[in-house]
Amino acid sequence: MNNNLVIKKLIDKDDKQAYEYAKRIGIESAKTNKYVDMIPDFASMLQDKNSFIRTRFFILICDQARWASNNQIENVFDQMKPLLNDPKPTVVRQCLNALHEVILFRPEMCDVIKNTISSIDLSIYKDSMAPLIKKDIDELMNRAD
């Protein structure tokens, strides 16, 4: 399947279908490097106005960590960073969770990830969400050490 068709299916108007397809790619990515060369294509969608789409592509990039080489993730990390400060706390939490893959398979990125997540401004989130994000940050920091 060509890259354009993959992207088209991942941004399908039917969010449920697009989400299921993204899950399938995530599962496949644990077994094969079939999608690793799509990291730049995935990164091009990180600024989409739809938070579901932005998050979906952030997670898919992280899913490629085990196969990435030649700084493939490092080269797009600046495009990924804004999602870690997204106004929607669920976006931030999902992205923090996805970064566990990167820390596991790309230990050379631990310092840049730690620096990035340590600067997340928790004060912009409701009192009910800020502690959960803080917990996610702490878990990721511990894994990165």
Model-derived segments and spans:
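Short inter-helical turns and helix N-cap capping residues of alpha-solenoid HEAT/ARM repeat scaffolds
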Residues: 13-15, 49-51, 87-88, 125-126, ...
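Residue-level signature of alpha-solenoid helical repeat scaffolds
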Residues: 23-24, 59-63, 97-98, 135-139
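Helix-adjacent hinge/juxtasegments
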Residues: 48-87
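Buried hydrophobic core positions in alpha-solenoid tandem helical repeats
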Residues: 5-7, 41-43, 73, 77-81, ...
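N-terminal "cap/leader" segments of large eukaryotic alpha-helical scaffolds
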Residues: 1-24
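Eukaryotic acidic, Ser/Thr-rich intrinsically disordered low-complexity regions
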Residues: 2-3, 114-145
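Flexible loop/turn segments at the boundaries of HEAT repeats in alpha-solenoid HEAT proteins
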Residues: 27-37, 65-73, 102-113, 143-145
